[in-house]
Amino acid sequence: MKIRPLHDRVVVRRKEEEEKTAGGIVLPGNAKEKPSQGEVIAVGNGRILDNGETRALAVKVGDTVVFGQYAGNTVKVDGEELLIMSENDIYGVLE
């Protein structure tokens, strides 16, 4: 099943969580922080402006983005957890 976001929404696959700290300490599941980076896997058509025109999104499929730890809403598609967020929740694109 595929998911197609509407308007200025973006679907992001969160990066894998770190299992160890930089010092080599293994973290239990509940001590891990949610990663705030991910890969864009789908984008909507764009934001609808007040004059009725549609402005394309600045991010595209395949971009690695940075977002707030609590940004977006989590959904499960085919057993995989994905985030759906507004483009405004994205801080930047890693290059």
Swiss-Prot record:
GO terms for cellular component: cytoplasm. InterPro entries: Chaperonin_GroES, Chaperonin_GroES_sf, Chaprnonin_Cpn10_CS, GroES-like_sf. Keywords: Chaperone, Cytoplasm. One of its GO terms (molecular function) is protein-folding chaperone binding. Disulfide bonds: none annotated. It is found in: Cytoplasm. HAMAP family: CH10. Together with the chaperonin GroEL, plays an essential role in assisting protein folding. The GroEL-GroES system forms a nano-cage that allows encapsulation of the non-native substrate proteins and provides a physical environment optimized to promote and accelerate protein folding. GroES binds to the apical surface of the GroEL ring, thereby capping the opening of the GroEL channel. This is Co-chaperonin GroES. The lineage of its organism: Bacteria, Pseudomonadati, Pseudomonadota, Gammaproteobacteria, Pseudomonadales. The gene is groES.
